A protein has these predicted regions:
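A generic structural motif
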Residues: 36-41, 79-87, 171-174
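Acidic, small/polar-enriched beta strand-loop surface segments
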Residues: 181-235
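Juxtamembrane "anchor/assembly" segments of surface/extracellular structural proteins
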Residues: 1-50, 88-90, 235
Length: 235
């Protein structure tokens, strides 16, 4: 069963706003990389498609159990609606670490300190079974970059200590090794009808940390529309 939930939902043990009956639903997870859902939904006569909205959360079974994915893009055609959603983990893209530095610490101590440095609190938990002692710093970046990096040496928890990330809704674990399937596919019957919107909020920013050419940081600036979103989108 695939369900859809309000933007602010943090528990997914009910049907939320209701169920969806997509023509297809594909979940793809890359090791220490992208974790996304693509869903195609018909314009069903029961109006289930009307529950689809930017920021709402789709919950579906995966090889790792029931997982939540937040909608960031909707593309309608005459036949159906294509929906793109990221695992709820990627809510962390919209948070921000201004400056975090620690001396010698264990991976768990570093994760705890990094979470305390977020621009605003989140429901996420961070656990690891990695060992070792090291210094670590992260500044002017989002938590996803601090955790996974961008491929440069020692720019993230993963590149510093190794390990593989396991994303279980709001529970994030970095382990020595995790088993995983590369993709998951669901197909349902189709019943096509009408037409609607085209939205994409993947590049929206509602809070800015200005940094001058000399590296000096100014006062944060909030958009007048910041309250239209479920949490600040920081850059």
């Amino acid at each position: 069963m695939i369900t859809i939930h309000e933007k602010t939902a943090q528990a997914f043990d009910t049907i939320g706003l209701g169920t969806l009956v997509p023509g297809s639903c594909i979940v793809t997870e890359e090791l220490n990389g992208a974790y996304e859902l693509e869903l195609k939904h018909p314009y069903d006569e029961g109006g289930k498609w009307k529950r689809i909205g930017i920021g709402n959360i789709i919950c579906t079974q995966t090889p790792n159990g029931k997982q939540a994915f937040r909608i960031y893009k909707i593309q309608p055609t005459l036949d159906n609606i294509t929906v793109n959603a990221r695992h709820i983990f990627y809510d962390l893209l919209d948070n921000y670490i201004d400056s975090f530095t620690t001396g010698n610490g264990t991976p768990q101590q570093i994760l705890n300190g990094m979470k305390a440095a977020f621009n605003y609190t989140t429901p996420f938990t961070f656990q690891t079974n990695l060992t070792g002692i090291s210094s670590f710093s992260a500044s002017s970046c989002n938590p996803v970059l601090a955790l996974l990096g961008n491929g440069e040496e020692n720019d993230s928890i993963i590149s510093k200590f190794g390990g593989e990330i396991k994303r279980d809704n709001f529970n994030i674990a970095i382990k020595n090794s995790v088993g995983m399937d590369r993709g998951f596919y669901i197909r349902y019957s189709k019943n096509l009808k009408g037409l609607t919107i085209d939205e994409d909020v993947s590049n929206v920013i509602t809070r800015v940390f200005p940094i001058g050419k000399d590296g000096l940081k100014g006062t944060t600036v909030d958009s007048s529309r910041i309250n239209e979103y479920h949490f600040p989108k920081v850059s």
